[in-house]
């Protein structure tokens, strides 16, 4: 089984480092900065970077790709529908890619960007989802529509509850504060907010999450819940009870929260 660690980058990014201790090969996900990865490789001289996996084209996710490829010769895989530097493998919905001996399924999840993809491995209960699904929240809509993002999140929400969710930003605390504003009487949200507040005070990261936890605490996956619908309508009187409309209202509310 592979080991996964977070390499912090910039203010709140995580570059996920996937490691196979038997082969001493590793892969990274969304290296916006090459420096943390190169530092790790220098400290672990007998390891080889074999793959660089990209979820979308934003610079804080691809900024280190070319330097890493030049230094290591790693294979670069990313969404075919977006401009990804030094890409070797074009990926689209339902494609399969083998990384560190594991065959990942590609899921198209447009919304944050139009070509955004996620990497899913069922047997490992592993989801690498970039900026689509966050712990307690979801990505902003820079390119896609609310309907697209709601559909993408619904697709991720249908994965098994035990699926571990590896997103790429430490936004959990602010997301849960918003979730508490939406559902102030949800005990799961209150408990998670308190727990993550303690973790962050201790300097601990809040990831990975799980699909089960997100279904209980993430308002963007709870658009059919009566309390969430009521909160969305209270915030936007024009909002209907239709789930994608509830999502759109919540996303607009979060953007100014």
Swiss-Prot record:
GO molecular function (one): hydroxyacylglutathione hydrolase activity
Database matches in SUPFAM superfamilies: Metallo-hydrolase/oxidoreductase
Binding site for Zn(2+) 2: 60-61, 131, 169
SMART domains: Lactamase_B
Domain of life, source organism: Bacteria
Binding note for cofactor: Binds 2 Zn(2+) ions per subunit.
Protein name per Swiss-Prot or TrEMBL: Hydroxyacylglutathione hydrolase
Source taxonomy: Bacteria, Pseudomonadati, Pseudomonadota, Gammaproteobacteria, Pseudomonadales
């Amino acid at each position: 089984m592979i080991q996964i660690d977070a390499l912090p980058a910039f203010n709140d990014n995580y570059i996920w480092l996937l490691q196979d201790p038997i082969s001493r090969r590793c892969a990274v996900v969304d290296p916006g900065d090459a420096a943390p990865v190169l530092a790790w490789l220098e400290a672990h001289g007998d390891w080889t970077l074999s793959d660089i996996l990209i979820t979308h084209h934003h610079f804080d996710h691809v900024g280190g790709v070319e330097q890493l490829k030049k230094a290591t010769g790693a294979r670069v895989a990313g969404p075919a529908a977006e401009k990804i530097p030094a890409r070797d493998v074009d990926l689209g919905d339902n494609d399969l890619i083998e990384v560190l001996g594991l065959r990942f399924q590609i899921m198209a999840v447009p919304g944050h960007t139009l070509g955004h993809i996620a990497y899913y491995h069922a047997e490992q209960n592993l989801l690498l989802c970039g900026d689509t699904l966050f712990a307690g929240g979801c990505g902003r809509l820079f390119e896609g529509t609310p309907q697209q993002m709601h559909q993408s999140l619904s697709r991720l929400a249908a994965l098994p509850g035990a699926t571990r969710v590896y997103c790429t930003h430490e936004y959990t605390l602010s997301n849960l504060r918003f979730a508490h504003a939406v559902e102030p009487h949800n005990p799961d949200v209150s408990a998670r907010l308190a727990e993550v507040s303690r973790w962050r005070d201790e300097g601990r990261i809040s990831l990975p999450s799980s699909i089960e936890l997100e279904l209980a605490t993430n308002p963007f996956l709870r658009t059919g819940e009566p309390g969430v619908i009521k909160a969305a309508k209270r915030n936007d009187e024009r909002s209907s009870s239709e789930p994608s409309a509830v999502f759109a209202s919540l996303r607009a509310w979060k953007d100014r929260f």
